[in-house]
Amino acid sequence: SNDGFKKISWEDAYGTLTDKIKSTNPDKIGCITGDLTNMETLFSVKELFNKILNCKNLDSRPVKTYVNNSSRTNYIFNTQISNIEKSDFILLVGTNPRHEATILNSRIRKSYLKNNMEIYSLNDVGDLTYPYKVISSNTDELKKIILNEHEVSKKIISAKNPIVIFGQSALKLNSSGYLFEGMKKFLSENNKINDDWNALNVLSNNASTVGAYDLDILDNETIDNVLSNQFELVFLFGQDNLNIKKKNEFIVYIGTHGDRGAEMADLILPSAAYTEQDGYYTNLEGNLQLAFKASYPPGEAKEDWEIVNEVSKKLKGKSLYTNKQELIDNLLNYLNQKTKKNGETVKNDFIKEEIFVDKIDYYFTNVIARSSKTMAECRNLKLVSLKTGTDG
């Protein structure tokens, strides 16, 4: 209602939600998962949608970016962070690693100091703590590199262990498919992608990105339809970075903080934060890792998978899983059986455009950081130092 939210019981919340699901055509239901969502949640949501709702409208991206998930090598950091020190040449494409991946950036700095390696960037991204050469940020320049018509092409070919890093800003471009696939082809043809060394890397910004792609939570039509208000019922699982103007759709927010997703929701189901539940995540390099909880969820908040399980029970009379271990077993089984498949065939046209690197609000990068007093203080100090010119 316009005057805020009304407190209801879990039973009423499930009742409201299941009534809404039953009265909505599955084609008109969509879901976007969040940037801190663990893999148990991602998998249970996928199973709920695919098996119970008979619906495939799932995505994990708040904006459309180019992803070819026919092979993991298209969306992970293939070179591995520990191998950066073996590199003798780096090309940054639409990324500011100092803000997007600080540990990775410190490795690049260490490698520069140790090997005096050359670093190039398509765009001036400010102080990275090491010198780098700036190439024009137009996609034309990258096209020339890919076609072996640029000095950087020669440097990549002559380098023993080159590294090319695509940031998320580059993958948002209209011609990102052309540029990414073109670079992959160029590196392959010059034997820079082989059993010992893979020079092609993608730098994902969020903890849940790689795991979501591994679980195929990716659908260009879904994100288009959410952003253009085509769905009647939208689930946001910890998703607070969507830039949409709400119209008539019914929005269900399952999350932890009263942030952007909750503000436009019609129904809020409180869940545990990532610090309040054990959960699997797949990191930048594609390794599965288990994060242990540091505390318990407040009040009546539940773990996300429990909410999904309960919704399934209310709809079909039976739960998806008898316990969390069964869910984890099913999840690991899915990952083990996953084979290479054909990615969505996207027409990869070249378009001349500027490669901008998105400015990251460093201390406010996610919903939990945005609600932290400490992070707010750090951010304010940074803003003050920028205004006074005392920022290094």
What are these regions (language model features)?
Residues S1-Q277, V311-S319, T339-G392:
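Catalytic alpha/large subunits of respiratory electron-transfer oxidoreductases
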Residues V67, G126, G286, E326-N330:
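Residue-level signal for alpha-helical context at structural boundaries
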Residues N116, L203-N206, N283, A301, ...:
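Short coil/turn motifs at helix boundaries and re-entrant loops, enriched in small/polar
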Residues E276-P297, S312:
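Glycine/threonine-rich phosphate-binding loop and adjacent beta-strand/alpha-helix elements that clamp
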Residues E300-D304, V308:
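Short, charged, low-complexity patches
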Residues W305-E306, G317-K338:
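Internal, active-site/partner-interface "lid" segment
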